[in-house]
Amino acid sequence: MADSNCGCGSSCKCGDSCSCEKNYNKECDNCSCGSNCSCGSNCNC
């Protein structure tokens, strides 16, 4: 139940990691369910 986007256009699911392009900004931040994920950050709920 997480339809939030991981800044790179990929959809981020609970527990899944957001894959991003190498060119994208790499700001690793933890994101909660429903919040936006930064590039390369893990979504933990």
From Swiss-Prot:
Q: What induces it?
A: By light stress, drought and salt stress.
TM segment ranges: none
- According to its UniProt record, in which tissues is this protein expressed? Expressed in phloem and mesophyll cells of leaves, vascular tissues of cotyledons, sepals and petals. Expressed in anthers. Expressed in root endodermis and at lower levels in cortex of mature region of roots.
Write down the superkingdom of origin: Eukaryota
The entry lists its GO molecular-function terms as: copper ion binding; metal ion binding
Keywords assigned:
Metal-binding, Metal-thiolate cluster, Stress response
Gene Ontology biological process terms from the UniProt entry: response to copper ion; response to high light intensity
- Family recorded in the similarity comment: Belongs to the metallothionein superfamily. Type 15 family.
Q: What job does this protein perform?
A: Metallothioneins have a high content of cysteine residues that bind various heavy metals. Functions as a metal chelator of copper (Cu) and zinc (Zn). Plays a role in Cu homeostasis in the roots under elevated Cu concentration. Functions cooperatively with the phytochelatin synthase PCS1 to protect plants from Cu and cadmium (Cd) toxicity. Plays a role in Cu homeostasis, specifically in the remobilization of Cu from senescing leaves. The mobilization of Cu from internal sources is important for seed development. Confers tolerance to Cd and plays a role in Cd and Zn homeostasis.
Q: In its UniProt entry, what is this protein called?
A: Metallothionein-like protein 1A
